[in-house]
């Protein structure tokens, strides 16, 4: 049985299609074994493709933008969709059934400053008809640091990927007031990536079938 190495940029229930492929026996049905890992905070899983430690990774499409902006050709290829909606939510301090995006203007909001999350948040603001620059945006660090900051009383709202917002609710810290996905609409959010040469292998074809 061939073994493939899979790496996640972030490990979250949001990537359940990929997790299910691993844990549901679909890879085994195609004669594949697997090992998986999670990239270190702040490091894209695409790095694991370049150094050979992973065969296939979960990655946002935007992680190739910086290379393209330099006029270079990305070394990896995005070949399979994981999901097609933004998986981030806004959580407030209190339940707000009458929430509107306009309430963000003038409020302190902990916003995820990762490349794609920030870009998508700005686009959601545009789609919702509000001025991003009127929001008191707080950069509290990575996802875990943001979560800690909000739990410690910083910010009126926080922008997080599921299931972190739902955990805040379960812990009595806040209430989810809206999701970004419906505001933005369908988009290429997260996908599978690999190197072109691996995609020519029988293992790659078996993985894609799974």
Predicted regions: what is each one?
Residues 2-130, 137-143, 156-163, 173-178, ...:
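Short, glycine-/small- and polar/acidic-enriched structural segments
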């Amino acid at each position: 049985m061939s073994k493939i190495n899979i790496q996640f940029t972030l490990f979250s229930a949001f990537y359940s299609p990929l997790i299910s492929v691993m844990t549901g026996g679909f890879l085994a049905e195609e004669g594949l074994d697997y090992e998986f890992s999670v990239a270190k905070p702040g490091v894209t899983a695409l790095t694991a493709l370049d150094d050979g430690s992973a065969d296939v990774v979960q990655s946002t499409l935007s992680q190739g933008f910086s290379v393209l902006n330099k006029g270079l050709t990305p070394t990896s290829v995005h070949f399979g969709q994981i999901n097609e909606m933004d998986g981030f939510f806004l959580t407030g301090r209190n339940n707000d059934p009458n929430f509107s995006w306009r309430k963000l203007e003038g409020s302190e909001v902990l916003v995820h400053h990762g490349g794609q999350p920030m870009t998508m948040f700005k686009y959601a603001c545009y789609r919702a008809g509000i001025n991003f620059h009127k929001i008191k945006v707080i950069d509290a660090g990575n996802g875990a640091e943001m979560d800690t900051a909000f739990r410690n009383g910083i910010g009126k709202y926080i922008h997080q990927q599921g299931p972190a917002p739902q955990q805040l609710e379960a812990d009595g810290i806040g209430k989810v007031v809206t999701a970004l996905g419906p505001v933005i609409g369908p988009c290429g959010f997260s996908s599978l990536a690999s190197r072109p040469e691996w995609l020519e292998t029988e293992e790659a074809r078996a993985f894609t079938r799974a």
